[in-house]
Amino acid sequence: MINFKNLETPYTIAEIGGNHEGNFQYAKKLCQLAINTNVDCIKFQLYKANDLVNPKISPERNNHFKKFELTKKEYIYLADMCSEANKDFNASIWSKNMTHYINKYMSFYKIGSGDMNCYPLIKSFLKYNKPIVISTGLATMDEIVNTVNFIRNENSLYAKNSMINLLQCTTMYPIKNNEANISVMNEYKKINNVGVGYSDHTIGSDALLLAAIYGANILEFHFTDNREDKVFRDHQVSLMPNEVNKLIQDIKKFKLLSGSPNKFPLETEIKNGHIISFRRAVYLNKNLKKGHKVKEDDLIALRPMEGISSVHFEKLIGKTLKIDIEKYEKLDFNFFE
């Protein structure tokens, strides 16, 4: 079972979503382009419009989603494409009666922002005991905590580490930079045993890089072949294949640059002798005779740190020399009393 918090670099999800616009041939093309990148997971949306939008109250919205539907056979074909290429397949499932035939392809379940408080849908996924990833657009912190508590009350397995993962998201296409609110991930980290991540709707990839630096375990972004001359809005916030590979390369570089939160001398510093050569020791700045009482102006702190560290500079003031010592000679505490 995948644990997103144990990965060395963030888990990346290329969200094709509805960018195929109901055209299966185009869906296959986008899927293959995503497979050819270094992304970890390729994601779609599974639904029947009548299970998602009320056709009486919102007929235009219902018709929009109907145009973007694919068939069961087509969804399975796309899932098999990913599986055969050793890429993870995933989908936001908006019609719970579609879960049974796609579950075997899913290593986790993704809840979109609009469904983060749709408890009947969420409950239908919990019987599979797979990690849950939840986008949190539109939500208050109280609503997020309530959803986490609902899941854990329904199935205690989800109290375990990284079984629930919260993605900061702003539900608009595109959003301004000041609407990304990536810092919210720090609040999510305070919820016991959850993983955190970011689902991006900005233009470009800067927000994703920042989220990686902030400790995102999961990064989700929309994916397309080309943003030019596209009417459907999601294309405008989507990354293209070369941009995906550049992003993943940059994430790995930035994670290396971030390093460890534990401060200690690194092997390269030790091996090259820099602890000695860069730090200072205490030396006499003049020749002095046995019996001389050391004054501050007799001492100087110089590189390299051979002998007595400059940390002990003050300790030598007022000491008496037990032997004659030459200027710049390496010192030892045994020379003083």
Which residues are covered by each model-predicted region?
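Catalytic cores and adjacent flexible loops of soluble metabolic enzymes
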Residues: 1-337
